Amino acid sequence: MNFNHFDEQGHAVMVDVSSKQETMRTATAAADVIMSAELLAAIARKSVSKGDVLGVARLAGIMAAKKTDDLIPLSHPLSLHSVSIEFDQDPAACRIQARCTVRAFERTGVEMEAMTGAAVAALTIYDMCKGTDKSISIANIRLLYKEGGKSGLYRREEAA
C-alpha cells in the first residue's frame, strides 16, 4: 500500500496536486447521533432549551466544512462551491443522521470537507443536547458518495 503523504525519509508532506486536472468534485458523508426517544421528539418539536438544534447544527457543519484545511494538517485549502447539511430523523432507531454534501471545481477531492461537516454537525447536536440526555453517542462517521477526479465514482452500499 502506497501512502503519498510521506516523503522518502518518512516525513509527512502535503501532496503536490499542481499537475492534476481540475474537475468537478462532489462528496457526501454522514454521521449518526443516537439518543433517547424523548430527546429525539423534543428536537423534532424544537423544544430543546438551547433552541433550534438542527438549525444551529446545520450552520456549524457548513462552517466546519469550510475550515477543514485548518483542522486536518495535510488537507489542501479548497474553494468550495457548495456545502449542504441535511438531517434524517429515524424514531425507530432513536437516531438522527447528519449528512453533508460538498461540491468544488478543484484538483483534489472534497471527501474530508464532507466528513468534517457531518462530524461537526453531529458534535453540535451533542453539545446542544448533552444537558438533557447524557447517553447521546455519535457513531459511524463515513463517506457515502464521491465523484470526480481520476479515481471516479464511489458509492457506499448502505443497509436499509
Swiss-Prot record:
Highest taxon of source: Bacteria
Keywords of the record: Lyase, Molybdenum cofactor biosynthesis
Catalysis performed (reactions): (8S)-3',8-cyclo-7,8-dihydroguanosine 5'-triphosphate = cyclic pyranopterin phosphate + diphosphate
E.C. number: 4.6.1.17
Active-site residues, Swiss-Prot/TrEMBL: D127
Keyword Lyase: yes
Annotated binding of substrate, by residue: L74, S75, H76, M112, E113
Pathway: Cofactor biosynthesis; molybdopterin biosynthesis
InterPro entries per the UniProt record, alphabetical: MoaC, MoaC_bact/euk, MoaC_sf, MoCo_biosynth_MoaA/MoaC, Mopterin_CF_biosynth-C_dom
Family: Belongs to the MoaC family.
Function per UniProt: Catalyzes the conversion of (8S)-3',8-cyclo-7,8-dihydroguanosine 5'-triphosphate to cyclic pyranopterin monophosphate (cPMP).
Entry-linked NCBIfam families: moaC (TIGR00581), PRK09364.1 (NF006870)
Name of the protein described by the UniProt record: Cyclic pyranopterin monophosphate synthase
Name of the encoding gene: moaC
